[in-house]
From Swiss-Prot:
Subcellular locations according to the entry: Cytoplasm
CDD domains: SmpB (cd09294)
Protein name: SsrA-binding protein
Gene that specifies this protein: smpB
UniProt-recorded Gene Ontology molecular function terms: RNA binding
Superkingdom, natural source: Bacteria
Purpose of the protein: Required for rescue of stalled ribosomes mediated by trans-translation. Binds to transfer-messenger RNA (tmRNA), required for stable association of tmRNA with ribosomes. tmRNA and SmpB together mimic tRNA shape, replacing the anticodon stem-loop with SmpB. tmRNA is encoded by the ssrA gene; the 2 termini fold to resemble tRNA(Ala) and it encodes a 'tag peptide', a short internal open reading frame. During trans-translation Ala-aminoacylated tmRNA acts like a tRNA, entering the A-site of stalled ribosomes, displacing the stalled mRNA.
Amino acid sequence: MAKKNSKTKNNDNTIARNKRASHDYHLEERFEAGLELQGWEVKSLRAGKANIADSYIFLKNGEAWLLGATFPPLLVASSHVVCDPMRYRKLLLNRRELDNLVGKVERQGYSIIPISLYWKHAWVKISFALAKGKQEHDKRADVKDREWKVDKERMMKHSVR
């Protein structure tokens, strides 16, 4: 049986990740939403050009909006439409989910932080979380815990031998 070439097809549907989110925030409750996109944005996402690192989600007039995400336009896409790579993008959520988010953001002081942007079948979805900002000492404690975990694994590996 022939060995499959792993370089031919990437099974990971992720377009972009916000790697700093778990470092800068305590991520609590996760959600998934669709995005309202224009045609040139979909083409850009199919090419894998997106950045959600410095983005966040805000609520206005009972709607959720993605701000700060950059989808740079392709050179060959959409010559008749003005492409704004930093425009606000509407998130597609149920009324119940929106009401839940509004309550937690306004009353309990949460922020809404995007975690990843990915394909789900033919649709672009965004995964985001309710988050509270970490203080500097929280970040240091996380680094300390991570280093201790690595050291512990190393000690266990050498003690088995």
